[in-house]
Amino acid sequence: MTGRTSSKRRVGSAAAVVTLALGGALAAAAPASAAGMNYKPISTATDVEVRVQSSGKCLEVADWRTDDGAPVRQWTCTGGDNQKWRFTDGYAVNVHSGKCLEIPGYSTAPAARADQWTCDKGANQRWGVVNDSQGSLAVVNFHSDLVLDVNSGTAADGAPAIQWYPTGVSNQRWYFNPSVVL
C-alpha cells in the first residue's frame, strides 16, 4: 500500500511540475500592454471627431444619452455633438453630455467596454496617444495600458468601443477631425 501511495505522489508531483512549466510558458506568451509605449496625454484646443481608421466611423455616446454608464460605440459620422470630444490633459469630455470617456470600474481586462461617466479625474478616464508613421493614433488608457479598439474590427454601426492589447490593427488606429497637432 505504501508503494502505491508513493507512486501517486510522484505522478501528482510530476503533473504539478508540468502544469507550472506550461503555465510559465503561457504567461510568457501573453499579449503585451502599452506600458512600454511612449504615450502622452491628449489635449485639443477645439472639439474633435474621433474616427476609427478601419471604418472611418465616429466614436460616439450612444443615442444622445447623458446618463452615467451610457455606452460608447462607433457610428456613421453625423456631425452631432454626441460624436464630438474635447480633450484636456488626457480627459476626453463628450461635448453633448459633458461626461468623460472611461473604462468602467478601473477594469484592466481586455474587452472591457468603454462608457461615459461623470468626470472624476480617475486614471481610468485618462487617455494618451502614440503616433504612427501614417499619421493615425493609438489611444491608450492610462490605468490599464490597453488601447481603445472597435470590437472585432467590424464596420457595423453600433459596434462597442472596448480596450484591448495593442496590436496596431486598423480598428485600434484613430484620426481626429479636424486634425490636431499633438
Label each residue range with its predicted role.
Residues A35-T66, N82-T108, R126-A155, R173-L182:
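Extracellular glycan-recognition/adhesion modules and their associated mucin-like linkers
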Residues G3-S6, L20, A45-D47, G79, ...:
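N-terminal compositionally biased, intrinsically disordered segments and leader/signal-like regions
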Residues M1-A34:
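Secretory targeting and sorting signals
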Residues T66-R86, T108-R126, A155-G168:
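Short, tandemly repeated low-complexity microdomains enriched for cysteine and small residues
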Residues V18, A29-A34, D47, N94, ...:
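Short stretches within intrinsically disordered, low-complexity N-terminal or propeptide regions
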